[in-house]
């Protein structure tokens, strides 16, 4: 482990000592986990001010709805080749605590260090996080993308609209319960002179490769 990296870790840990934050160094990267999502804005503001993290390079999220589950029935063999058949999972869209995690990537050019700050979100039905677009302008579009893809809302965001999907799009494509085929497909209708939407005609199927471990 780099001595400089350890030094940065200890200094940042001291700055955040008054908050519910856990930190670690893994694979040469510093990561801090915030326990309470209500503290996100305050902690990030403190990091920017006191350790000069002047750049927010990315905001993203992870959906852990199917974490640890498999699309393959490995318990029993149903074919002569030794492979089980892929199956479609039935997802329950009810609230699941800690289903979503939000991740911030920060850069301090003054201290020449990058860190990752993440937080598990407690309520999966009303997912609300304070926007940090007032701290870093780069968060504006990044938070819009997270909202568009995952359905996470950002309180006090100046313009929280979809940024990648079409107007009137239903659902959030990077959620694990969103079908891979989507709900509708679009094509240009020459008779109508416009784009029309139609239900998808593609059958949803498992396309996760079967991994065999010795």
UniProtKB/Swiss-Prot annotation:
User: GO terms for CC?
Assistant: plasma membrane
Q: According to Swiss-Prot or TrEMBL, what is its membrane topology? A: Peripheral membrane protein
Q: Does the keyword Cell inner membrane apply?
A: yes
List the PROSITE patterns hit by this protein, alphabetically.
Answer: COMPLEX1_30K
Q: Which UniProt keywords apply?
A: Cell inner membrane, Cell membrane, Membrane, NAD, Quinone, Translocase, Transport, Ubiquinone
> Does the UniProt entry include the keyword NADP?
no
In short, the EC number is 7.1.1.-
Principal subcellular localization? membrane
* InterPro entries per record: NADH_DH_suC, NADH_quin_OxRdtase_su_C/D-like, NADH_UbQ_OxRdtase_30kDa_su, NADH_UbQ_OxRdtase_CS
Gene3D superfamilies xref list: NADH:ubiquinone oxidoreductase, 30kDa subunit
The terms under GO molecular function for this entry are:
NADH dehydrogenase (ubiquinone) activity; NADH:ubiquinone reductase (non-electrogenic) activity; quinone binding
Q: Which Pfam families match?
A: Complex1_30kDa
| Chemical reaction(s) catalysed | a quinone + NADH + 5 H(+)(in) = a quinol + NAD(+) + 4 H(+)(out)
Share what the entry says about its subunit structure, partners included: NDH-1 is composed of 14 different subunits. Subunits NuoB, C, D, E, F, and G constitute the peripheral sector of the complex.
PANTHER family in the cross-refs:
NADH DEHYDROGENASE [UBIQUINONE] IRON-SULFUR PROTEIN 3, MITOCHONDRIAL, NADH DEHYDROGENASE UBIQUINONE IRON-SULFUR PROTEIN 3
Which family, according to the similarity comment? Belongs to the complex I 30 kDa subunit family.
Outline what the protein does: NDH-1 shuttles electrons from NADH, via FMN and iron-sulfur (Fe-S) centers, to quinones in the respiratory chain. The immediate electron acceptor for the enzyme in this species is believed to be ubiquinone. Couples the redox reaction to proton translocation (for every two electrons transferred, four hydrogen ions are translocated across the cytoplasmic membrane), and thus conserves the redox energy in a proton gradient.
> What is the name of this protein?
NADH-quinone oxidoreductase subunit C
Lineage of origin: Bacteria, Pseudomonadati, Pseudomonadota, Gammaproteobacteria, Thiotrichales
Query: Quick one: which gene encodes this?
Result: nuoC
